[in-house]
Amino acid sequence: MRLAVNIDHIATLRNARGEQEPDPVAAALLAERCGAAGIVCHLREDRRHIKDLDLARLREAVTTKLDLEMAMTGELQEIALKTKPELITLVPEKREELTTEGGFDVARHFAVLKEFLKPLNDNGIEVSLFIEPEKKAVDLAREAGADLVELHTGLYAQKELENNTDLELQRIREAATYAKSIGLRVVAGHGLNYRNIGPFREIPEIEEVSIGHAIIARAVFTGLDEAVREMLRLIQ
């Protein structure tokens, strides 16, 4: 299993003082040196953490894989086509939320989604949809033109706090198995941390996990290099 490191909260920390440090690009390069297989950043519509300049600099610097998380808007589509990350992940977005609260509603946006994805597909940019671990969502993601799906693990993380993860883990496992069986690649993310990541080693269909907040929080105490390496030890 591979690790993609989300560096959004390096930018959050920088923006808290309106300064230049810490630098998200420096964090991305360090994560890569420590074994991360990809770097994730979310260019939100309100630019609350990652800024346009950060994205441009990340595109120049990242040598593994750059995964741009974004909402389905014309502005961000143009930015993606110009920047050409290896992967874009479409996520739902609400201005009032602290973090992404759920999976993309593929059924609701299906007709528009197919048209939105076409120029990205045509320009060689792989597309992932951040979805709930449900068979219908997986089917629609494939039909819309996604190359892979990122299964939303937020409810699993919430259940972990309640010591009640079995049903949600089974739902994720079944969705991953089904997605793989119909030709989609599978990754997972949201709320994963050093306590709850272990069971994902037993789901071979999930090829990568995307983790940000837990790693950045651990890095405050251990340093980013050790935080990344510790997570890699847990997933490999």
From Swiss-Prot:
<dbReference type="GO" id="GO:0033856">
    <property type="term" value="F:pyridoxine 5'-phosphate synthase activity"/>
</dbReference>
<comment type="subunit">
    <text>Homooctamer; tetramer of dimers.</text>
</comment>
<dbReference type="InterPro" id="IPR036130">
    <property type="entry name" value="Pyridoxine-5'_phos_synth"/>
</dbReference>
<keyword id="KW-0664">Pyridoxine biosynthesis</keyword>
<comment type="function">
    <text>Catalyzes the complicated ring closure reaction between the two acyclic compounds 1-deoxy-D-xylulose-5-phosphate (DXP) and 3-amino-2-oxopropyl phosphate (1-amino-acetone-3-phosphate or AAP) to form pyridoxine 5'-phosphate (PNP) and inorganic phosphate.</text>
</comment>
<feature type="active site" description="Proton acceptor">
    <location>
        <position position="42"/>
    </location>
</feature>
<feature type="binding site">
    <location>
        <position position="99"/>
    </location>
    <ligand>
        <name>1-deoxy-D-xylulose 5-phosphate</name>
    </ligand>
</feature>
<feature type="active site" description="Proton donor">
    <location>
        <position position="190"/>
    </location>
</feature>
<dbReference type="GO" id="GO:0008615">
    <property type="term" value="P:pyridoxine biosynthetic process"/>
</dbReference>
<dbReference type="InterPro" id="IPR013785">
    <property type="entry name" value="Aldolase_TIM"/>
</dbReference>
<keyword id="KW-0808">Transferase</keyword>
<feature type="binding site">
    <location>
        <begin position="212"/>
        <end position="213"/>
    </location>
    <ligand>
        <name>3-amino-2-oxopropyl phosphate</name>
    </ligand>
</feature>
<dbReference type="GO" id="GO:0005829">
    <property type="term" value="C:cytosol"/>
</dbReference>
<feature type="binding site">
    <location>
        <position position="49"/>
    </location>
    <ligand>
        <name>1-deoxy-D-xylulose 5-phosphate</name>
    </ligand>
</feature>
<feature type="binding site">
    <location>
        <position position="191"/>
    </location>
    <ligand>
        <name>3-amino-2-oxopropyl phosphate</name>
    </ligand>
</feature>
<feature type="active site" description="Proton acceptor">
    <location>
        <position position="69"/>
    </location>
</feature>
<dbReference type="Pfam" id="PF03740">
    <property type="entry name" value="PdxJ"/>
</dbReference>
<comment type="pathway">
    <text>Cofactor biosynthesis; pyridoxine 5'-phosphate biosynthesis; pyridoxine 5'-phosphate from D-erythrose 4-phosphate: step 5/5.</text>
</comment>
<protein>
    <recommendedName>
        <fullName>Pyridoxine 5'-phosphate synthase</fullName>
        <ecNumber>2.6.99.2</ecNumber>
    </recommendedName>
</protein>
<keyword id="KW-0963">Cytoplasm</keyword>
<dbReference type="InterPro" id="IPR004569">
    <property type="entry name" value="PyrdxlP_synth_PdxJ"/>
</dbReference>
<feature type="binding site">
    <location>
        <position position="17"/>
    </location>
    <ligand>
        <name>3-amino-2-oxopropyl phosphate</name>
    </ligand>
</feature>
<feature type="binding site">
    <location>
        <position position="6"/>
    </location>
    <ligand>
        <name>3-amino-2-oxopropyl phosphate</name>
    </ligand>
</feature>
<feature type="binding site">
    <location>
        <position position="44"/>
    </location>
    <ligand>
        <name>1-deoxy-D-xylulose 5-phosphate</name>
    </ligand>
</feature>
<comment type="similarity">
    <text>Belongs to the PNP synthase family.</text>
</comment>
<feature type="binding site">
    <location>
        <begin position="8"/>
        <end position="9"/>
    </location>
    <ligand>
        <name>1-deoxy-D-xylulose 5-phosphate</name>
    </ligand>
</feature>
<feature type="site" description="Transition state stabilizer">
    <location>
        <position position="150"/>
    </location>
</feature>
